Each structure stands twice: as structure tokens, then as C-alpha cells.
Curated annotation (Swiss-Prot):
Keywords associated with the record: Glycoprotein, Hydrolase, Metal-binding, Metalloprotease, Protease, Secreted, Signal, Virulence, Zinc, Zymogen
Lineage: Eukaryota, Fungi, Dikarya, Ascomycota, Pezizomycotina
Annotated residues for binding of Zn(2+): 429, 433
GO biological process: proteolysis
Obligatory cofactor(s): Zn(2+)
PROSITE patterns: ZINC_PROTEASE (PS00142)
Function description: Secreted metalloproteinase probably acting as a virulence factor.
Membership in a protein family: Belongs to the peptidase M36 family.
EC number: 3.4.24.-
Name of protein: Extracellular metalloproteinase 2
Amino acid sequence: MHGLLLAGLAVALPLGVAGHPARPQTALSPRGIDVNAYRFTSTAKYNEHKTTSQMVQSFAYSKDDDYVATATKLVKSTFPNMTFRTVKDHYIGTNGIGHVHFKQTAHDIDIDNADFNVNIGRDGKVFTFGNSFYQGEMPKTNPMVKRDYSDPVKALHGAIKTLKIPVKPESAKAMPMDEVETFKFEGTSGALSEPKAKLVYIQKDGNLHLTWRVETDVGDNWLLSYVDSKESETVHNVVDYVASADYKVFAFGLNDPTEGQPSMIKDPWNTTGSGSPFTWHGDGKTDYTVTRGNNVAAQDNPSGGSQWENNYRPDSPQLSFVYDYSDQMEPEDYKDFAITQLFYTTNTFHDVLYSLGFTEEAGNFQVNNGNKGGKGNDFAICNAQDGSGTNNANFATPPDGQPGRMRMYTWTTSKPKRDGDLEAGIVIHEYTHGLSNRLCGGPANSNCLNDLEAGGMGEGWGDFYATAIRLKQGDTHDTDYTMGEWAANQKGGIREYPYSTNMQTNPYTYADVKGMREVHGIGTVWATILYDVLWNLIDDHGMGKNVMPKMVDGVPTDGRTLAMKLVLDGMTLMPCNPNFMQARDAIIDADMALTKGANKCSLMKAFAKRGLGSNTKPGKGYTNNFDMPSGC
């Protein structure tokens, strides 16, 4: 779950669509489910480029193999006695790296948290790879032969009872779907879509456990609950997909109403690259006169309900979305302006990310992919002034082919209330959950930021992109930024420290992760490190006036968009459920792929400054190391 919890307020805050907290932090959902208690523990290993180059020197390449075949050969040679399947989400990124993902199996049943990702370079050779394959003893018999497991309906009842999921299963019937031992449940009520169950193994505590993976979408939580196949009230683990024309808007780069005034912007898709070929108001089949198109459907949702398609949207046959806003107005009195702002911010960010490599093949959010790969029919459903909560926001990211869902709330921390739709940093943070969940582990797997440390980096990436985009001309290495300060009406923002390169202003280092038990605190450490990365690259390459990247041979020409590109490319390289060290190495490897390592020393200088030096030790010790690699 992803959202925005804040700190130090004398109000009752919703605790679980995980707000973007800062100080006192909790992992409880609105119903009291402690999702942190059910997180998977990552077993991922990542082989960065230098190590991979040495390891695969003897690997047998064939000039006749395509990148998928080469990746498959590597998996077979690494684990010759294991079975696996190729996940159908492979693609070649804009940096020329091919990405292929594999899922380990046992008796043709998926081991749901056992993954192998292979990244193939432009030369056709293995660039990097990572895996979390299970290497223990395999089950000797196929459980499907004697059906040695409970009925899936019992698993549904068990998940609902144990986790207090607000779904009524009394009349549930399991109806077979196309995949083996996969069912949907008819006759339930309370979920936004029919619950599903699939028989899968999971690895836990060094052993395999046969489970029913029960999927329930109830809005604030979209859960995958791994229920023991025999003891239906035993839930081993849980994954949550939720992370908490003419337009008169605050222009992209203005974070909130304190930074400027609304202005008129005409046909913005003409200046945001090739990400929106149908404009923002069409999907190749239908042209809309409301705030709906190929990338985004933005509407109000005052009831907080699950319906969105027929909800209110501003409508202008002339595509003139010009509405009034004043900081003296209550949010419901400027809902047209708020919906338009949300539509503008999310579409612009979609186009920025598209130019950086979050394309159709990579799993982006679009209805019509235009025969460019990936799965369509999955734009972002964005609810403005959603009535299901306050002082918060969240984004749900199912796998590619299913729409993402953003819920933006009003904030009751000032009079009049404030609307999170008007703070671009919150919107960008939420949308970035969609980016990171689609890229890490591949677009078909949204379970790869479930480990506590990995989930923390998911929060940190959101803050990083929100902060990078709000930088202004004239900012320097000494400029500090906060998160959520305007919406929360809280000086200093909703994080423990502002983002700063000054160690006195923000003293966070890698060692501070030790002892943290909540993703937002961990995320603040990660975003702090990336803020130093950002400014080292800006100091080296400058910062363009426009956040839309200018490219030369696929490489951004300024430091800000180069940092955004390297962080994005790093997500595509790292293994499922990565840790800080693996994410650091993946960013270094992304630079190797993009610039042949031209920025390695500047990157490592930032990492080492915050304790992630070249001799940092793996494991959960979280001991700082400030060493630079040889050659820097």
C-alpha cells in the first residue's frame, strides 16, 4: 500500500493506504491489517556488470540466438536441474538493453516469489542478471495428482477471516479459469471485482509451501493473500498492489500554489514528445471532450466508491478547460479546476516518463498501445477529491494490462481545506509507484517491491521524481526541498528531514536503515541518497530549463534528466525485491549501458557520501562504508 501519512498532527489520519508519512509511522491499514507483518523476505541476488562480465566469459553465445534465447540459455546453465517458464513480458528498452524475466516452477506450479531476470546488452551478451530462485529440496510428488490441498473457497474464507477483508463470501462459488488450478469466485459481495485464487508455491524460511494465492480488490487494499493449501486460516504472506486543448493549471514544475499562479497552457502534448500520439483526449478510437484519453481518466469521486466510469468530469466541446481557483475556496467549489490539474499533471508525467523509457513494452499505462508491444487497456484511473479518505493519497498497481488506480484526497489540516490534486509532488509520487512496480521484476509482476527494504525504495523513488521535477532555474547544490508541506500545512513537510545535500540539514546515511520498520522512513533515506546523486550529475552536466529531456544518441544532455533516466533504467536491471546495494549497483550499471560509465565516479561519490561506498557489506548489518572504488 502506498500513500501519504503525515506526522505531528492533532487529527485522526487514515492509517494504511499508506500515506506519505514522515515521523511517527505506521503500517496499519484502515481496517487494522498489519501488512508489514506479512511481507515476503527477499532472497534476491544481483550480479552487476563487472562481475557478470567475468562470470560469463565462458558462456556459449550463438550469433543466431535472439536476446530471449540467450537469456534462457543463461538460466539453464545457472540452474541446470531446475524448471522454469519464460514470463511473456520481455522487451528491449530505449537504452538498447533487452529485459527477460523467468518464473521458477515445481511440477508446473509457479513458485510465486522465485524469479530470474536477465539483461542482454546491445552486443547480444549478458549484461547483468539477478535471481531469487529456490535452491532447497523440491517436493517429490505432484500435489495435483491426488489434489492434496483444500478447496479454493475455503482459502477465500480463510483470507477474509484472518485479514478481516470486507468481502462477504457466504455464497461464493469457485469457477475454473483458463490457467491450471486458477479460479474466480462468483456470488461474493464487497470487492470491486470478482476475487480470484491460483494454486502456487512460495518459498519461506528455507522451504516451499503450497498455497492458494487469493486476490481481493477492496479499494484501499488490493491484496494477494497466500493462504496455506491445507490450513485455510494460515496466511503465510500478503502483497498489496495499492501503495497509498487549453488548460488553466499550475504549470508542470510548480509544485503547489505557493510557487506560482495558474496559467493558460495550449495543446501541451505538442511539447511533451511522442508519448501521446492521440493527444490527451483520444485513444485512437474515441475522441473525448472530457478529462479522459489514452493515458488518464480523471474524475471526481466524492462518495469514495468503486465506480469511476460515469463519475463527473469537466466537459468542454471546445477543449477549453478553464476554471477558477482561489486559496479562499473550499475544494468542492473548485472541483473542475482540481480534476483538470490532476489530468494535466498525470498526462505530463506520463509523457516525461515515456521519453525516459517507460514505454508500451515496459508496461506503461495506456488504453491503446498502437502495436508497440505490452498490454493495453490499462490507463491510469485518477480520482480527484476522493471521499474514501482524507490527508492522504494512494496508487494501486496491478500487472500490465490492468488499469492503475490513483486516489487523491482533500486535506483537513487547514481552513479552508486543501486539495492534494494541487500539490504536484504528491501526484508524481503516487504515479511513480506505478512506474517502479511495473519496471522492477518486469511489467507482468507487481510483487517485486514487497520486501520491507524494497518497498522503502519504492517510496523513495516517488519522492525523488517529485523533487527532481520541481527544481527551478537558479537552484544550486545548496537548495533544500520538503515533501507535502503545502497540502499538510506543516512547515518542514511530512518527512523527518528536508531533502538536502547538507549533512547537517539532513544527516541520513545508509546505517539509519537499521532498525527502521516502516517503508516511508526507509524511503526517505533512499531519496536522500538519490538527491545527492541528482545534484552531482547537475553539477557535472547542468540543468535544462525544460523537464522534458533533450537527447543525443539516447542520452539526456542535462544532469537532471540524466539522473531521472539512470534511476529509471536501474529499476529495469535490478532483481525482484532488491536492496539498497543492488539498487546502487543497478544505477551504476545503467550508466555503463547508457554512457559507457562516464558518470561512475560522480555516482559513487554520492553513494559513498551517504554510507553506500564500494566496500559496503551485504546483509542486514547496515554498516556505513565511505570508500570510493579504484579509479575514482
